[in-house]
UniProtKB/Swiss-Prot annotation:
This is E3 ubiquitin-protein ligase RNF144A. GO terms for molecular function: ubiquitin protein ligase activity; zinc ion binding. The chain crosses the membrane at residues 250-270. The keyword RNA-binding does not apply. Autoubiquitinated. It comes from Mus musculus.
């Protein structure tokens, strides 16, 4: 008995084999899938695993062609995805797509109550100032800008650690802002929840790296020096040994590039005159008149 992926050699010899750009294997055409938008072709098994992995991890954008050098930068259509994944994975894909649509829709917003998460409609779309939004599911009234409870006559706070549920007051939450389980990305203002682990956070929406406790940017802090001083000292959530190992790796990478450049510099200096001479000879040969 033969599987759908492997067939006898005498059968394979009759069909032309197509190469998959993901696994670099060669398979018959019926075991390959072509993306309609860009016409890039991959083996069905690889493409299926690629799509399932993106959906399970929580895709941030449309599922693009796996080929990084795709000339058309194609994307998989919904009907193509539905043909290759299970029903429960497809259901999760549609849910993620809907959440992203609401996130970027100026007419809609999510109810900030953690037990509700209904979609609310903004009354006045053209209004530039924060407006009152009332959730029809839980009757919570909140600000359209900062998603906190409605605060008439007051400006929006810079950061909101958590949104209170209906019937609760601030006295029920004695935790400091740094200990809040839900915060907003300081760059794109998307809500992020942290259960435990590392305090170096990266927003899935805008890829901004920041400190969970003080919300300071860590985009350029490759060595995580931020956690060596100040109020966030020793709050990274990793052992000192793992931090030292991380820094050693980063320094090693930069040192390796520097050493490579240093070693290659003499060769580049020696090769430059030869390259210039060759170019001069070629240009001189082009200018010489043809013999008569």
């Amino acid at each position: 008995m033969t599987t759908a992926r492997y067939r006898p050699t005498w059968d394979l010899a009759l069909d032309p084999l197509v190469s998959c750009k993901l696994c670099l294997g060669e398979y018959p055409a019926e075991q390959m899938t072509t993306i309609a938008q860009c016409q890039c072709i991959f083996c069905t098994l690889c493409l299926k695993q690629y799509v399932e992995l993106l959906i399970k991890e929580g895709l941030e954008t449309a599922i693009s062609c796996p080929d990084a050098a795709c000339p058309k930068q194609g994307h998989l259509q919904e009907n193509e995805i539905e043909c290759m994944v299970a029903a429960e994975i497809m259901q999760r894909y549609k849910k993620l797509q809907f959440e992203r649509e609401v996130l970027f829709d100026p007419c809609r917003t999510w109810c900030p109550a953690s037990t509700c998460q209904a979609v609310c409609q903004l009354q006045d779309i053209g209004l530039q100032t924060p407006q009152l939004v009332q959730c029809k599911a839980c009757d919570m009234e909140f600000c359209s800008a900062c998603k906190a409870r409605w605060h008439p006559g007051q400006g929006c706070p810079e950061t909101m650690p958590i949104t209170f549920l209906p019937g609760e007051t601030s006295s029920a939450f004695k935790m400091e802002e740094g200990d809040a389980p839900i915060k907003r990305c300081p760059k794109c203002r998307v809500y992020i929840e942290r259960d435990e682990g590392c305090a170096q956070m990266m927003c899935k929406n805008c890829k901004h790296a920041f400190c969970w406790y003080c919300l300071e940017s860590l985009d350029d802090d490759f060595l995580l020096i931020h956690y060596d001083k100040g109020p966030c000292r020793n709050k990274l959530g990793h052992s000192r040994a793992s931090v030292i190992w991380h820094r050693t790796q980063v320094v090693g990478i930069f040192a390796g590039f520097g050493l490579l450049l240093l070693v290659a510099s003499p060769f580049l200096l020696l090769a430059t005159p030869f390259v210039l001479c060759c170019k001069c000879k070629c240009s001189k040969g082009d200018d010489d008149p043809l013999p008569t």
